[in-house]
Amino acid sequence: MAVSASLVKELRERTGLGMMECKKALAETDGDIDAAIENLRKASGLKAAKKADRTAAEGVVAAKVADDGSYGVLVEVNSETDFVARDAGFLAFVDSVVEKAFSAKAADVAAVNDEAMESTRQALVQKIGENIGIRRVSLIEADGGLVGAYVHSNNRIAVMVQLANGGSVELAKDVAMHIAAVNPQVVNPEDMPEEVVNKEKDIIKAQPDMEGKPEQIVEKMMTGRINKFLKENSLVEQPFVKDPEITVGALVKKEGASVVSFSRFEVGEGIEKKEEDFAAEVAAQVAASKGNA
């Protein structure tokens, strides 16, 4: 049967899919719009699976903290392109992930990505045409202290901080903003993992100015440079980004507080993004269209 333009329009509005895809779905069901939607939903799993090997290295991070500062969550949700990361449907999905993580006090992706969430994700993949993924979730509980957060204006960096023994929401936000800007590795120098320190020592030993020097001189120089490395990469030792005359540790101590822990998410960090030139991308699309013909 011929499919009317009004049916195609209605299916597009209800699914957000393209005109040709909607027309084909309606033709296959003889104009039964509910059956067409059901078939499209069944197909979404296949479509999502086909896109799963594409690198999702863009996206946004988001945070939500309880009004009383008792706990908070961070999430990172990835897309393939920055364009989709600004899409209203994608951002609505991110909001639903944050709300689910917050209400469930989720500490990992598994606690968020239940059957309903996965179904929503797959439907979004079908609608948008890109791989979408919930990459990570972080939970920090105050344990009698205070949790605060900062999300940078571009939604690409988010930080959560746990304070103890005092402080305020404003202080926690300031410390979180500093962490977003400076990216320390640990809270205190003694928190630095031994393997990181040993790796840094190997790097220092290999530097040209160490060659040929007596062992005691080398050790003295090594100690000085390791201490400098620890100071530069430990939150409490860093000059506060809003007032470099004071360290973050001194700032927090002034309010009778201390930093217990922090969590920092930056979109795409650690993901190796596949680079393709435009010609190769077009060729791949042409090949795919021939394969589907």
UniProtKB/Swiss-Prot annotation:
<comment type="function">
    <text>Associates with the EF-Tu.GDP complex and induces the exchange of GDP to GTP. It remains bound to the aminoacyl-tRNA.EF-Tu.GTP complex up to the GTP hydrolysis stage on the ribosome.</text>
</comment>
<feature type="region of interest" description="Involved in Mg(2+) ion dislocation from EF-Tu">
    <location>
        <begin position="81"/>
        <end position="84"/>
    </location>
</feature>
<protein>
    <recommendedName>
        <fullName>Elongation factor Ts</fullName>
    </recommendedName>
</protein>
<keyword id="KW-0648">Protein biosynthesis</keyword>
<dbReference type="InterPro" id="IPR018101">
    <property type="entry name" value="Transl_elong_Ts_CS"/>
</dbReference>
<dbReference type="GO" id="GO:0005737">
    <property type="term" value="C:cytoplasm"/>
</dbReference>
<keyword id="KW-0963">Cytoplasm</keyword>
<dbReference type="InterPro" id="IPR014039">
    <property type="entry name" value="Transl_elong_EFTs/EF1B_dimer"/>
</dbReference>
<dbReference type="InterPro" id="IPR001816">
    <property type="entry name" value="Transl_elong_EFTs/EF1B"/>
</dbReference>
<comment type="similarity">
    <text>Belongs to the EF-Ts family.</text>
</comment>
<dbReference type="Pfam" id="PF00889">
    <property type="entry name" value="EF_TS"/>
</dbReference>
<dbReference type="InterPro" id="IPR009060">
    <property type="entry name" value="UBA-like_sf"/>
</dbReference>
<keyword id="KW-0251">Elongation factor</keyword>
<dbReference type="GO" id="GO:0003746">
    <property type="term" value="F:translation elongation factor activity"/>
</dbReference>
<dbReference type="InterPro" id="IPR036402">
    <property type="entry name" value="EF-Ts_dimer_sf"/>
</dbReference>
